[in-house]
């Protein structure tokens, strides 16, 4: 294939898993085509002399033979293969890499811990929404990366020699999930963290983002158990108690924890508890991407956007030919409503952002068909890749779009976990009203309105005579009033 190919591949030879990401460049952003992950547990093959066992190397080569088949269609200049902590440590890494290069047909680069941390940060910066000033945490199999930064720039980079595989072998070797093993694992992790904690705290952060399998597992557990997606120390301690209650690693059962992740979950959990405690982290969310995404965006030389969510929404509006003027019109009305009730309802800024995002996408279902457009919209948003939005935020957007008109499905608003159920109901009410009053698709036909909230009662005041002059509008509002009353949302329109 010629070098005009739009395909790119990034391979990460990690200490616990080998990963391959294949993407296609589309109009300045990336479309994921393939993700392959295999548990190789390379770090478990290191002995006390840091010799990598033949069995571990063979597991690695076997995995690379699978990857090699997919790489044949991609120009070598558009492939990056990096190896991390275990192959930095292994004294016989050269033997493994020589054969790996032969299998893949392209160079394998062993990167330093700092370079790994930088790439992880770039992957997060390109794919994760939220505040600009962030702390990124990635717990790997044999190393843990901690990075602070603002926008695209890192301010401090650390790669520490502790990981979920090495801590498993060191502190849970007897497969016993007792308090003593957890205490020893946490104490050791805190000792590794202590020398770098001051510098990380000095640079500071507004948001903390986790980019590892441990954090992914926590997210899956919390989604399965209907909790909100924010990881807190309290939740980590609860999960530790649950693990201790299970007694042994082979008996570890937590709702939402897959068998594949269970083996290294307790060791990863102990490291994460130590990080939360030592750095006094209030809460953490899951990153949209990490090392592999950093490699891909690096090959593409794409600048980091200041607002990833806005880029995502623009791309989707273009792709599904959404009427952007109408989306903006609905967003403007919704923002105006939100600003009038936010104090009474104690709404947070993130809720405003998510409401505006729902407005930007509310007509996406029309790209399938007018009939059942809200259901089509919810399906598309639930299943599209939305960089900058967390899984729980995607679910909330889909739920809001499902309930943008017609009778309200209250249970769906209560099943999302991005915001409390009451907030989801409030955002839904504002979205529905904004869509109604922007429905004429002209700025000059949107009436001047005031919206007041008194507990759950909404009072909407329209210009004098508006309802008389707009009989269809009056009918639509009467129907909306009825639908809101069915779910005990009191609405008065004057």
From Swiss-Prot:
GO terms for biological process: guanosine pentaphosphate catabolic process; guanosine tetraphosphate biosynthetic process; nucleobase-containing small molecule interconversion. It catalyses: guanosine 3'-diphosphate 5'-triphosphate + H2O = guanosine 3',5'-bis(diphosphate) + phosphate + H(+). Keywords: Hydrolase. It holds the Pfam family Ppx-GppA_III. The keyword Hydrolase applies. It comes from the Bacteria. Pathway: Purine metabolism; ppGpp biosynthesis; ppGpp from GTP: step 2/2. Its EC number is 3.6.1.40. GO terms for molecular function: guanosine-5'-triphosphate,3'-diphosphate diphosphatase activity. Belongs to the GppA/Ppx family. GppA subfamily. Catalyzes the conversion of pppGpp to ppGpp. Guanosine pentaphosphate (pppGpp) is a cytoplasmic signaling molecule which together with ppGpp controls the 'stringent response', an adaptive process that allows bacteria to respond to amino acid starvation, resulting in the coordinated regulation of numerous cellular activities. PANTHER family: EXOPOLYPHOSPHATASE, RETROGRADE REGULATION PROTEIN 2. This is Guanosine-5'-triphosphate,3'-diphosphate pyrophosphatase. The lineage of its organism: Bacteria, Pseudomonadati, Pseudomonadota, Gammaproteobacteria, Enterobacterales.
């Amino acid at each position: 294939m010629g070098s005009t190919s739009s395909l790119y591949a990034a391979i990460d030879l990690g200490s616990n898993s080998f990963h391959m990401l294949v993407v296609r460049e589309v109009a300045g952003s990336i479309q994921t085509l393939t993700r392959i992950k295999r548990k190789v547990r390379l770090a478990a093959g290191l002995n006390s002399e840091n010799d990598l066992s033949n069995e571990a190397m063979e597991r690695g080569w076997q995995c690379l033979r699978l990857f090699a088949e997919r790489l044949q269609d991609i120009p070598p200049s558009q492939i990056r293969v990096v190896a991390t902590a275990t192959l930095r440590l292994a004294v016989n890494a050269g033997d493994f890499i020589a054969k790996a290069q032969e299998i893949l047909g392209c160079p394998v680069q062993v990167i330093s811990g700092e370079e790994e941390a930088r790439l992880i940060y770039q992957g997060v910066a390109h794919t994760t929404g939220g505040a600009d000033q962030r702390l990124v945490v990635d717990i790997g199999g044999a190393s843990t990366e901690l990075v602070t930064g603002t926008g695209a720039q890192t301010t401090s980079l650390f790669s520490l020699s502790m990981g979920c595989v090495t801590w498993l072998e060191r502190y849970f070797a007897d497969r016993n999930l007792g308090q003593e093993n957890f205490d020893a694992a946490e104490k050791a992790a805190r000792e590794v963290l202590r020398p770098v904690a001051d510098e990380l705290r000095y640079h500071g952060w507004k948001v903390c983002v986790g980019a590892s399998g441990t954090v992914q597992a926590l997210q899956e557990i919390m989604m399965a158990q209907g909790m909100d997606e924010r990881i807190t120390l309290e939740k980590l301690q609860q999960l530790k108690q649950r693990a201790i209650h299970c007694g042994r690693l082979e008996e570890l059962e937590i709702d939402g924890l897959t068998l594949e992740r269970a083996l290294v979950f307790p060791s990863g959990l102990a490291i994460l508890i130590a990080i939360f405690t030592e750095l006094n982290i209030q809460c953490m969310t899951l990153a949209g991407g990490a090392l592999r995404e950093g490699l891909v965006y690096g090959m593409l030389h794409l600048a980091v956007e200041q607002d990833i969510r806005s880029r995502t929404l623009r791309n989707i509006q273009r792709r599904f030919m959404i009427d952007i003027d109408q989306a903006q019109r609905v967003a403007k009305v919704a923002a105006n409503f939100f600003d009038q009730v936010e104090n009474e309802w104690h709404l947070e800024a993130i809720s405003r952002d998510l409401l505006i995002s729902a407005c930007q996408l509310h007509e996406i279902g029309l790209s399938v068909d007018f009939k059942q457009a809200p259901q089509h919209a919810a399906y598309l948003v639930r299943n599209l890749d939305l960089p900058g939005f967390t899984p729980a935020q995607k679910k909330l957007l889909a739920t809001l779009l499902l309930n943008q008109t017609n009778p309200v499905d209250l249970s769906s608003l209560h099943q999302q976990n991005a915001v409390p159920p009451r907030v989801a109901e409030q955002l839904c009410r504002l979205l529905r009203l904004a869509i109604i009053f922007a429905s004429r698709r002209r700025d000059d036909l949107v009436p001047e309105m005031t919206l007041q909230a008194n507990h759950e009662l909404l009072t909407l005041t329209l210009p004098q005579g508006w309802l008389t002059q707009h009989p269809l509008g009056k009918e639509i509002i009467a129907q909306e009033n009825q639908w809101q009353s069915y779910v005990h949302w009191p609405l008065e329109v004057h």
